[in-house]
């Protein structure tokens, strides 16, 4: 089954789920689907960012992560841990750069960092880095943050 066919099946059931973004890839094809709208879209080669909106929504944290990744790629071939470090930033965006998403601006600023922790009720749970080599090898590392246990668990997969 092709990625596009798979996502078309998911699209038919999109109302069964809370909001989500899903990336699906095979060989040199990467597709994204969001049940927020927009349908199945092909992702062109390049640097992209994804948060709790559509792919490449120009939120400060998305733009900052894309810029940081571009800098990292200019200087070396990043390792998974380098990529995960980019996503652990707790730096908050200035209020004047924040989008108006309908929540209070103080909360908007609190959640404007790459890594979010708002007391015990909201925040980053999983951070995932993926490297897809020119030779076709794929490596994925995901870190799960469990604040109540004050621990991080990580999973690594490669093929």
PLM regions with names:
Residues 1-159:
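N-terminal nucleophile
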